[in-house]
Amino acid sequence: MNIITVVVTLVSALIGLVLGYFAISLKMKSAKETAELTLLNAEQEASNVRGRAEEQAEVILKTAERDRQTLKKELLLEAKEEARKYREEIAEEFKSERQELKQIESRLTERATSLDRKDDNLTNKEKTLEQKEQSLTDKAKHIDEREQEVVKLEEQKALELERVAALSQEEAKEIILTDTRDKLTHEIATRIKEAEREVKERSDKMAKDLLAQAMQRISGEYVAEQTITSVHLPDDAMKGRIIGREGRNIRTFESLTGIDVIIDDTPEVVVLSGFDPIRREIARMTMETLLQDGRIHPARIEELVEKHRVEMDNRIREYGEAAAYEVGAPNLHPDLIKIMGRLHFRTSYGQNVLRHSIEVAKLAGVLAAELGENVNLARRAGFLHDVGKAIDREVDGSHVEIGTELAKKYKENPIVINAIASHHGDVEATSTIAVIVAAADALSAARPGSRRESMEAYIKRLQDLEEIANSFEGIKQSYAIQAGREIRIIVHPNKVTDDQITILAHDVREKIENNLDYPGNIKITVIRETRATDVAK
């Protein structure tokens, strides 16, 4: 290898190094420019993103502020509305409490007045009892003195009879006994008259005062009993549609309702007859709906009967609730309320039993207030006293027995149970409220126009009254007058003395009370008439 070759090689290597250096420098410069451009672009993009983020953040903040203001306004409005409602509720409660306080104050004032009046009555009664006790003491002393006189007179008379008439002791005894019996009969009759007069004056006045105060605050109704209901038809052609082909419609109607459908020659009228007023009312509503609807066939009849039966159950419950509210009998068992509602469709001697129960409850409340008893308990007992009549056609036993069992079943107060059991005298009354309920029941039933009897029962009662009067000795004739409110008895004057007619009136009264059931009172009048006649010639 010569020097030239070495030089060429070195020069080539040097040139290659220089070219490589320049290439690397260019690449590094290009990479730097690219990096700077990328960095610039990144910074610009970051600036743009930051700007957009700031704008979005500002929008979000504005939206949040607007939502916050809206929510704040809504919350303020809701708070104001709730505050207004709360103020109204508080005002209503205050108003209700003020009314209750006024009512309580009024009742307390009435109670205080009643207590003052009762205190005065008790004071007067104490004075009357003291006077009566003194009078009885004087009478007892007088009787003892008279008895001693009678004994002395009997001894003297016995001696005189034996001495003067030469009678035996037995004959003398018979004369003395007869004479003494006549005197004692006269004495007893006189004392009975005096006692009757005193008791009648006091009892009549007290009873009239109590009953007058009770009756003037209670308004009664005149109600008539019905066993048929008439339904008006738009035209007589509807009668054929009611009967249906081969009588299918009318048979379906009668079998589902238990009510007889009477279709006769009376124009534009169909009569529903049945003794169960609830079934009769369901039948009436069904018939009227069928006539209005026009679709009369067995399936439609069955559908409407079931529909109106449900409606009737609701009506019965509403009647019971309204009656309980009217008399002020709270917390009654729901089943008991429904049973009481059935009484709206029950009558007794033509009197609606539910209205009668309401009337008895009000009368019992008035009488209880006058006598210082529990008014609410008396009203409750009076309201429930005839509850047994609602189901006495479905359950065996008298309405008193059924009502007593119902009251026990629904855990009524023992005083209420006894009032129900004793209001017809079947059981002894163990409380004043029971006696009050019996009196209110009799008062409601006996007021004019409240009840009516069937002609057969009315005639039977008059006949029984005359038979009782004629069962005594010495009766010439008796007449039941004033619709059975009075019995006049005419006696034989040679068999009954003036003193004996008072005792006879008492005996007749006791027998009537023990053997007859009757509304109100019956006056017994005994008449003894002696006539003397002669003929002037």
From Swiss-Prot:
Q: Which UniProt keywords apply?
A: Cell membrane, Endonuclease, Hydrolase, Membrane, Nuclease, RNA-binding, Transmembrane, Transmembrane helix
Q: What is its main location?
A: membrane
Q: Where is the HD domain?
A: 353-446
Q: Segment Disordered: which positions?
A: 112-136
Membrane-crossing residues?
A: 3-23
Under the cellular component aspect of Gene Ontology, which terms does the record hold?
plasma membrane
**One Pfam family it belongs to:** KH_1
List, for all copies, the residue spans of the domain called KH: 227-287
Q: Name one GO biological process term.
A: mRNA catabolic process
Could you give a GO molecular-function term held by this entry?
A: RNA binding
Q: What class of enzyme is it?
A: hydrolase
Q: Does the keyword Repeat apply?
A: no
Q: Which domain of life is it from?
A: Bacteria
Its membrane topology is listed as: Single-pass membrane protein
Q: What does this protein do?
A: Endoribonuclease that initiates mRNA decay.
Q: Which family does it belong to?
A: Belongs to the RNase Y family.
- Protein name per its UniProtKB record: Ribonuclease Y
Species name: Streptococcus suis (strain 05ZYH33)
Gene encoding this chain? rny
